[in-house]
Amino acid sequence: MKFGYFDDKNREYVIVTPRTPYPWINYLGTEDFFSIISHMAGGYCFYKDARLRRITRFRYNNVPTDAGGRYFYIREEDGDFWSPTWMPVRRDLSFFEARHGLGYTKIAGERNGLRATITFFVPRHFTGEVHHLVLQNRTERPRRIKLFSFIEFCLWNALDDMTNFQRNYSTGEVEIEGSVIYHKTEYRERRNHYAFYSVNHSIDGFDTDRESFMGLYNGFEAPQAVVEGNPRNSVASGWAPIASHYLELEIPPLGEKELIFILGYVENPEEEKWERPGVINKKRAKEMIERFKTGEDVERALKELKEYWDELLGRIQVETHDEKLNRMVNIWNQYQCMVTFNIARSASYFESGISRGIGFRDSNQDILGFVHMIPEKARQRILDLASIQFEDGSTYHQFQPLTKKGNNEIGGGFNDDPLWLILSTSAYIKETGDWSILNEEVPFDNDPDKKATLFEHLKRSFYFTVNNLGPHGLPLIGRADWNDCLNLNCFSKNPDESFQTTVNALDGRVAESVFIAGLFVLAGKEFVEICRRLGLEDEAKEAEKHVKKMIETTLEYGWDGEWFLRAYDAFGRKVGSKECEEGKIFIEPQGMCVMAGIGVENGYAKKALDSVKEHLDTPYGLVLQQPAYSRYYIELGEISSYPPGYKENAGIFCHNNPWVAIAETVIGRGDRAFEIYRKITPAYLEDISEIHRTEPYVYAQMVAGKDAPRHGEAKNSWLTGTAAWSFVAITQYILGVRPTYDGLMVDPCIPEDWDGFKITRRFRGATYEITVKNPHHVSKGVKEIIVDGKKIEGQVLPVFNDGKVHRVEVLMG
């Protein structure tokens, strides 16, 4: 069942009913100011950090869902009132449409012949949202309405805002000047920032105190001021500051009225905080408001935003026979990669924006799907991540985006973390050819007195694994590896503690991870190549010895007969083995080890992937492990705390499905690779949205597995490494156009029935227009490549860096 449709020409998903299976959201903002907005205008905005600089308030896990946002109430002459976004009033509308575009959302609602259309977006180089409201009278009689705007301010620190009521009920402060409401809570003391909400029209009243506007016992659906048709002109003093403009408007027959609201954020230099004692300096806010006085100003900024996305998405465009594949690669997958890079895992409708910041493992993987768009941002992120490493090569698990300082709020000691830095750095160098990044001086633990080159950071990442091997010579798992919930040293009996942050019960010198072994080989090969290209042959040989040894160790101690083991627990017992009662086979080592090339030559790789298909496959994707754990295993940790079929306990953890798709291309099975890719890709799931529930235009982290009552239901959409890895899988391994240190490799591995495809790729200062033909209907293999009319040797397209377009013909066979 569908609840909308793709508008590929305008690069929008169009939702035609407010009653979707779950709120379907979008993200606004490209730099420092970001917003989450649902198809009903719910959500919130923040500056840089969703925890420390939350601007508007939102209530998670609320009834009804999606409570709090940017609301407009239209009150008609007969007392009927409604919201064009349907929420929060939920009055029936004769027309509803929400268009989620790239960095903007347009919502239209109509009732009684009056249509209201609101375009929400964050302009480029702007710290605020624009709300462009157009009221159209579609009748032949004049319409007199009372319009109320509404947003509720958060008192900056989102955690404190929802917990420290004894203080917060007494701190709220505002200023009102003309048609602008300023939120200045705590500005009198340590803060130098404020927010504001403005409208480009004279107002007939206002409210800034929530209780005065709402009434103590009313909800968003029926504020007392709207019910009665009169604002209170309230000035907040403590309690809950809001911003509500009241306008009395007349719209002529078949005429329209246009209004521009700005929800903005301003920081003032300490010496310029005040206009005069007690009155904030509004200079910057007035400049922001002045920028959007007319509809033409709005359209110009929206056009600039769309052109920005034109340029970014134009760096990779594909043309295949499959329109769903085209729209995912050309539009939505790249868009999601940008969002995950900007937001990491911090703020969504499943992440509160409070506990999680920029994850080390997460963000290094996000770079893989983002680096082609804005490589300079990827470069800075790599350096920021390296700066939270410790001198032994280990690292904090995350940093707070506002401070860029590492913290252990969601735990530490995840022994896979350091290796991801090698993969992101190598991806950056392959994309850009910029080897100078390795010479950048980066501190350890943000300590300027402890600096080393980025290359030295990579070296310590590599040797952290070498120096932390267990009894079998496999890497020690620490608190966990990529699977945060496989806690082999935790042994938690206390329900009041977190698996991720509690002190491990054991010293961690026994439990080993086969997954990290595969990751070490994959990243280690890159480290060896980097050393060689830097002329460090001795370093390269030494590192290569460790990589070869790990391959041998994995084949000897990490192979279970039909698939790769998952781990050894704290007692040296196998995890993910046919010997286990439950949890006999796990997906992660099968994908990672084969991606790393382990077992390809001796047939183990094919056996492992065949076992994945036999034991882990479902109509909705590959489950993480089987059989699901039916009880709590204290020696395994959080993974066994979930009911069967959910999350890590045999849910379809979409993030690792692309690893298996890539692994299938390693052994040349294009049909199977594309089948795995397609099963979790949202555009292919649009027709079953009532089952899938989350947005049909972005990937979700998790889909309920076959052991779950709600098999096929997705959760945790948007902020997931699935986005980056799916983009890597389809563009670099299935379509097979991937950056190398020397140029663009063309090595497709596609379904045999494909006739071919086209891909345009901007790479290192040139544009490659690549046409792949598959007349013999093979899955893998390149017979010849012709560049600009000349046949080349091998499969790597040269680096031109000449600003020109180069035409490439690839013949498979």
UniProtKB/Swiss-Prot annotation:
InterPro entries: 6-hairpin_glycosidase_sf, 6hp_glycosidase-like_sf, Carb-bd_put_dom, Gal_mutarotase_sf_dom, GH36_catalytic, GH94_Enzymes, GH94N_CBP, Glyco_hydro_65_C. Optimum temperature is 85 degrees Celsius. It catalyses: D-cellobiose + phosphate = alpha-D-glucose 1-phosphate + D-glucose. The active site is at residue 484. CDD domains: GH94N_CBP_like. Optimum pH is 4.5 to 6.0. It holds the Pfam family Glyco_hydro_36. SMART domains: CBM_X (SM01068). The keyword Transferase applies. Its EC number is 2.4.1.20. The keyword Transferase applies. One of its GO terms (molecular function) is cellobiose phosphorylase activity. Keywords: Carbohydrate metabolism, Cellulose degradation, Glycosyltransferase, Polysaccharide degradation, Transferase. Pathway: Glycan metabolism; cellulose degradation; Glycan metabolism; beta-D-glucan degradation. One of its GO terms (biological process) is cellulose catabolic process. Catalyzes the phosphorolysis of cellobiose, yielding glucose 1-phosphate and glucose. Is inactive against cellotriose and the disaccharides lactose, chitobiose and xylobiose. May be the primary enzyme for processing cellobiose in T.neapolitana. PANTHER family: CELLOBIONIC ACID PHOSPHORYLASE, CELLOBIONIC ACID PHOSPHORYLASE-RELATED. Belongs to the glycosyl hydrolase 94 family. This is Cellobiose phosphorylase. It comes from Thermotoga neapolitana (strain ATCC 49049 / DSM 4359 / NBRC 107923 / NS-E).
